[in-house]
Curated annotation (Swiss-Prot):
It comes from Dictyostelium discoideum. Gene3D superfamilies: Tetratricopeptide repeat domain (1.25.40.10). This is Tetratricopeptide repeat protein 4 homolog. TPR repeats lie at residues 90-125, 130-163, 164-197. Keywords: Repeat, TPR repeat. Belongs to the TTC4 family. The gene is ttc4. GO terms for cellular component: nucleus.
């Protein structure tokens, strides 16, 4: 039978929600009955010794696994008669489960069968029911079913708040699921009943260490981000003061083009700016990276080295041999990102392509009123005259 069939067609998430709501409702009923009992006592009447609401919890309605095919404990099983009390029957099932559990992982399913049988008796000894649940949780802990461990132990400690094994197993399962705060809370609850419990103290220490490690990593990340922002603000200020260069936020991850994620615009001791520049060839999804495009360098200076006119060297992707100096055009898009310095006023215009002449130096382009450096300068390289070129300029790509 599938999981959905066994749970009435519910998904795992829906089943978890149903379970959580049922436990909450049951706890509320317990509190209401406790209050009612106190009122009975105050009136000199006899309080209700126990309730049966817990018997309707989904945890007691799970489908049993198949009965063991070869049962070496059959004699003990057959000794159960109608004369036995529910508590005696449940204890016999539990003992059979314990025997199978001790035989190891190959018999875990058999052990589960008998722990489920013990629970299905629904005896009125809540201390015993607490043990059956925590025993079943022990098997699921070994099987890695941590969610089931938490469910069983949550009810187990409600049945018997002094069941230290249930606290321990629940805290370990929460630790395995990286629910460190929940694990600490579970340990604290158990330790409130038994302050000297070493197992719970150890689990709590481990959970707290994990939690502190996470907090430290998060704080380190925040500190690093703040430091980076301060560095960007300082660089943006210096660039703008230098020549109205407007440093902006990146428009996409540049590390795929620069091969170094920390590549950025720099200013040397002579106050000269060095631009790492990316040339994008949108027709083919290719790129070139220029590590140091100095302020007085023209675009032609670099393009002629990449596409020498006297001895053309065509890129492997340029099968039609269309990317030559006489056809290559360079473009940037206006206002494609926002400047880091919030006090810089940018003229709001519709985005458009601006062509850059080969003879223009990069300083003039970068200082253009509508050019904002997207972390590092980017320029688009296209070949004039073909179909892609027309679509590119029309923004129909």
């Amino acid at each position: 039978m599938s999981t959905a069939d066994a749970t009435g067609g519910l998904t795992e998430e829906e089943e978890n929600i149903l379970w959580e709501r049922s436990v909450i409702a049951w706890k509320q009923q317990k509190e209401e009955r406790k209050k009612s009992n106190q009122e009975l006592i105050d009136r000199g009447e006899k309080p209700i010794d126990y309730d049966n609401d817990w018997k309707d919890l989904p945890i007691f309605m799970q489908e049993l696994p198949e009965e063991p095919s070869s049962n070496q404990y059959l004699a003990a099983f057959q000794s159960l008669s109608n004369d036995c009390t529910p508590e005696e029957r449940a204890e016999t099932f539990k003992n059979l489960g314990n025997d199978y559990f001790r035989e190891g992982k190959s018999r875990f399913n058999d052990a589960l069968y008998y722990y489920n049988k013990a629970l299905s008796v629904k005896c009125n000894d809540m201390t015993k029911n607490s043990i059956y649940l925590s025993n079943r949780a022990a098997i699921n802990m070994e099987l890695g079913n941590y969610g089931l461990v938490i469910k069983d132990c949550t009810v187990s400690v409600e049945f018997n708040p002094l069941n230290m094994k249930a606290y321990s197993r629940m805290a370990r399962a929460q630790l395995q699921l990286s629910k460190y705060q929940d694990s600490i809370k579970t340990c604290d609850l158990g330790l409130s009943h038994e302050p000297t419990n070493k197992d719970l103290s150890t689990i709590r220490e481990n959970a707290n260490k994990k939690l502190q490690d996470i907090k430290k990593r998060e704080q380190d990340k925040i500190d690093k981000e703040n430091q980076l922002k301060q560095q960007q603000q300082l660089l943006a200020t210096k660039l703008y003061e230098k020549n109205k260069y407007k440093l902006g936020h990146q428009i996409f991850d540049m590390s795929q083009y620069t091969y170094q994620s920390d590549r950025k615009v720099t200013i040397d001791q002579n106050n000269d700016v060095h631009f790492p520049v990316v040339f994008l060839y949108p027709e083919f999804g290719k790129s070139d990276f220029i590590m140091d495009f100095q302020e007085d360098h023209t675009f032609g200076d670099h393009l002629q080295m990449m596409f020498p006119p006297e001895n053309p060297e065509f890129a492997p992707w340029d099968t039609k041999k269309e990317y030559t100096m006489d056809r290559i055009e360079v473009y940037f898009e206006t206002n494609w990102t926002k400047p880091i310095l919030s006090d810089i006023k940018i003229k709001e215009i519709e985005k458009k392509w601006i062509r850059v002449k080969h003879t223009t130096d990069i300083a003039k382009v970068i200082s253009h009123p509508t050019y904002i450096i997207p972390e590092i300068p980017i320029f688009y390289i296209v070949s004039r005259g073909n179909l892609f070129y027309k679509k590119f300029l029309e923004n129909k790509l």
